[in-house]
From Swiss-Prot:
Family stated for the protein in its record: Belongs to the influenza viruses NEP family.
Protein name: Nuclear export protein
Gene Ontology cellular component list: host cell nucleus; virion component
InterPro entries: Flu_NS2
UniProt entry keywords in alphabetical sequence: Host nucleus, Host-virus interaction, Transport, Virion
């Protein structure tokens, strides 16, 4: 995995964890959890691609991996919409920068997962 992506994930998660958005902090915690889950999924998919022979064990271990892949894309789309919404409503420049970076990272991760999945199919 690209070290810039790793540091981007870590930076975004750290910055988001420092934000306090009042009554919506539960929503923010949910977003942070989904970011962490997405990072783990992307990492495991990338490792499977690197080991190319691992596609068979991936399919055997989880016969519904394509369904899981579809769910991850839905999560990414939800996160993109949520981040866009937060970006529109916040007036704090620190939060705006964080959400803009999170949005860019989501687009990059979505593209990477698409690339990995095409290599696995």
């Amino acid at each position: 995995m690209d070290s810039n992506t790793v540091s981007s994930f870590q930076d975004i998660l750290l910055r988001m964890s420092k934000m306090r958005l009042g009554s919506s902090s539960e929503d923010l915690n949910g977003m942070i959890t989904q970011f962490e889950s997405l990072k783990i999924y992307r990492d495991s998919l990338g490792e499977a691609v690197m080991r190319m022979g691992d596609i068979h064990s991936l399919q055997n271990r989880n016969g519904k991996w394509r369904e899981q892949l579809g769910q991850k894309f839905e999560e990414i789309r939800w996160l993109i919409e949520e981040v866009r919404h937060r970006l529109k409503i916040t007036e704090n420049s620190f939060e705006q920068i964080t959400f803009m970076q999170a949005l860019q990272l989501l687009f990059e991760v979505e593209q990477e997962i698409r690339t990995f999945s095409f290599q696995l199919i």
